[in-house]
């Protein structure tokens, strides 16, 4: 009864008004699974290919009708009749059908839409919530959220090069408390921006995008907002950065417009260390360019024992590239973005590889999102203990937070909120 009888994709819009792929998978039992694919703004060079039409007369070339056609034709023909519980087998069929390293023929947006919709259909058919279907019956942790309250870089139109300034409510006793803490700080920050004459418009991920003079000024604003909301920075709340360094790395230097200077990789590592020494920063994502492995090694040697160093553009959720990073001893955490690799099975393989080598994993959204909340279930299913899914505004971000509230409610006494223990690779 769990055999796939129909697969149908359509073109929908994401949170930036750009087209993306949504897929419905129908089973013999009458159950349907639906999933929609996210899209990134700052993307790693080695990410799986997001297939766009290139027809400038539609959506400025960003249409996804080709990817939709691939789902409705080649992929559907290959998968109809197969048991939806055979997730790995289904994903492998799509990988082989595509035949490239980067999903360049079918498009990762096509394969991922099907992969996630199959999992949702199979979970529904099994009578299980998605997080239980994927994660099994063992104990589960709710993730500590990284909440993006100040946006810069590719996510905002201001002079800040560092892309995301985030708060992490590590002192909370539950996810519900953590969410309240983040929301209260977010609203305190809005009042603070208002009082200083900064605009309170928000960026792609829901954070504020004030035109500040330096990155330190952004961090100081976060300290003030945390205290104004009644919490202690460094105790109740820790900070996290996503530098997205590849976006300002050029000709062997890191160019910070807000600071008015350029840095070698050694100098930039020292700059980041100075921020860590001055502010309660526990996590830095993409602190070096994705191809600057020497810089990554320097940064890991300098900060890897006390700060979580997350590889996003560096690893692109690819088990092969992650294995290389582990061997070279760079970074100590993996950012997990399902559309960087293009199937659920490969995503889970990357998380498992990270875990076995004492690298933390951070489940992540993209800047172009939909109401799909699959990553909330994935964060719990994998027990990765951290999630990055934007600020405390925009419905596309709230969909994930609200789903985590529901999951915590369902788990009841069995729900664990790890707090600082989420940084187990640091011995926290």
From Swiss-Prot:
Known pathway: Carbohydrate degradation; glycolysis; pyruvate from D-glyceraldehyde 3-phosphate: step 4/5
Gene3D superfamilies in alphabetical order: Enolase-like C-terminal domain, Enolase-like, N-terminal domain
Protein species of origin: Neisseria meningitidis serogroup C (strain 053442)
Protein name (database record): Enolase
Principal localisation: cytoplasm
Localisation: Cytoplasm; Secreted; Cell surface
PROSITE patterns reported for this sequence: ENOLASE (PS00164)
Binding site for Mg(2+): 242, 285, 312
Cofactor: binding details: Binds a second Mg(2+) ion via substrate during catalysis.
Catalytic-site annotation from UniProt: 205 (proton donor), 337 (proton acceptor)
Cofactor(s) the record lists: Mg(2+)
Residues engaged in binding (2R)-2-phosphoglycerate: 163, 337, 366-367, 388
Enzymatic reactions: (2R)-2-phosphoglycerate = phosphoenolpyruvate + H2O
Disulfide bonds: none
GO function term, MF aspect, one: phosphopyruvate hydratase activity
GO terms, biological process: glycolytic process
InterPro entries to which the protein is assigned, alphabetical: Enolase, Enolase-like_C_sf, Enolase-like_N, Enolase_C, Enolase_CS, Enolase_N
Domain of life: Bacteria
Enzyme Commission number(s): 4.2.1.11
CDD domains membership: enolase (cd03313)
PANTHER family from the UniProt entry: ENOLASE (PTHR11902:SF1)
Gene designation per UniProt: eno
């Amino acid at each position: 009864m769990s055999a796939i009888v129909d697969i149908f994709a359509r073109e929908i819009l994401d949170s930036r008004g750009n087209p993306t792929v949504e897929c419905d998978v129908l089973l013999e039992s009458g159950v349907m699974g639906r999933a929609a694919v996210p899209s990134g703004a700052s993307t790693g060079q080695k990410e799986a290919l997001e297939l766009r039409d290139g027809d400038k007369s539609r959506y400025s070339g960003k249409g996804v009708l080709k990817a939709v056609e691939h789902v409705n034709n080649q992929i559907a023909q290959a998968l109809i009749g197969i048991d939806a519980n055979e997730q790995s087998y289904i994903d492998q069929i799509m990988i082989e059908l595509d035949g490239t390293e980067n999903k360049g023929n079918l498009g990762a947006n096509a394969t991922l839409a099907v992969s996630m919709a199959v999992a949702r259909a199979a979970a529904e058919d099994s009578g299980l919530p998605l997080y239980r279907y994927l994660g099994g019956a063992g104990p589960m942790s709710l993730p500590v959220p990284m909440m993006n309250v100040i946006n810069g870089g590719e996510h905002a139109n201001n002079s800040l090069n560092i892309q995301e300034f985030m708060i992490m409510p590590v002192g909370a006793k539950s996810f519900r408390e953590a969410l309240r803490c983040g929301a209260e700080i977010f609203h305190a920050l809005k009042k603070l921006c208002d009082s200083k004459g900064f605009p309170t418009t928000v960026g792609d991920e829901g954070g504020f995008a004030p035109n500040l003079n330096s990155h330190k000024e952004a961090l100081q604003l976060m300290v003030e907002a945390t205290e104004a909301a009644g919490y202690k920075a460094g105790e109740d709340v820790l900070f996290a950065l996503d530098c997205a360094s590849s976006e300002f790395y050029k000709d062997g230097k890191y160019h910070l417009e807000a600071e008015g200077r350029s840095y070698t990789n050694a100098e930039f590592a020292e700059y980041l260390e100075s921020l860590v020494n001055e502010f309660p920063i526990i996590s830095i994502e993409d602190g070096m360019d994705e191809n600057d492995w020497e810089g990554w090694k320097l940064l890991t040697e300098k900060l890897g024992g006390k700060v979580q160093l997350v590889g996003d553009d560096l690893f692109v959720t690819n088990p092969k590239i992650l294995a290389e990073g582990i061997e070279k001893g760079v970074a100590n955490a993996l950012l997990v973005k399902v559309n960087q690799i293009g199937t659920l099975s490969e995503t889970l393989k990357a998380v498992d590889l990270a875990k076995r080598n004492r690298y933390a994993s951070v489940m992540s959204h993209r800047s172009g999102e939909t109401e799909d909340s699959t990553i909330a279930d994935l964060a719990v299913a994998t027990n990765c203990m951290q999630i990055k899914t934007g600020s405390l505004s925009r419905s596309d971000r709230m969909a994930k937070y609200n789903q985590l509230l529901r999951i915590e409610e369902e788990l009841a006494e069995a729900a664990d909120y790890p707090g600082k223990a989420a940084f187990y690779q640091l011995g926290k």
